Amino acid sequence: MASSEIDRSEAFQQLTGFPIGRWQRRLLDMLLSGEPPPGVALPTGIGKTSVMTLWLIARGFGAALPRRLVYVVDRRVVVDQASREAEALKNKLAPAVQDPLLRALRQGLGLGAEAELPVSSLRGGLADDAAWRLDPAASAIIVGTVDMIGSRLLFEGYGVSRRMRPLQAGLLGCDALVVLDEAHLVPPFAALMRSIVADASPRGSGGDGMPPGLRLMTLSATGREASDARIFRLEPEEAKEKL
């Protein structure tokens, strides 16, 4: 689906109720190129969870991005907040939506006439509603805690039967973009994720018969990785922008 900058900005406004910011526009351009940065260093309170919306728009407009976004954070309260945002995106893209741009986004995401965007939360105290694993070909958003996502990636999912563990590990480890929020609080898990991504690097893009691999994008407010030129961080003019 071809898009213009106006279309992308309008899509963001419709999905979130807010105009797109400069840094969000720049990050969206990177996602549209199919090359998300390995890390994003942004100050607290700037709206880092909007990366879910940016991924959704980029995929809807045809970007070569993983079909599953796995948003991981170690605090339940943030998991619940991110889950609410994901559910809001799901509702905005409901089958009954009439807006032409949002309908085009649905089509770009591969959602059938009656299909909803699969959104699932994986954290302690909540039952897995299974929406994310019913159709491996569907675009989906999974939000979960470090222990719930990590254990599944390592074939040891909490409360998951032995028969289902390979399926869940495969869905989270292939054709998935893991967004690790507050990565500075869980350095061992961040290191584990980088190791898993490195081990999976021989995987292809899907066109060579190999399943697309796992990709990682960390979110952090500390800027510990700022020495890495590939890390996305605010430019001076973006830092001055009113939130």
Model feature map: region roles:
Residues 1-243:
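N-terminal helicase ATP-binding lobe
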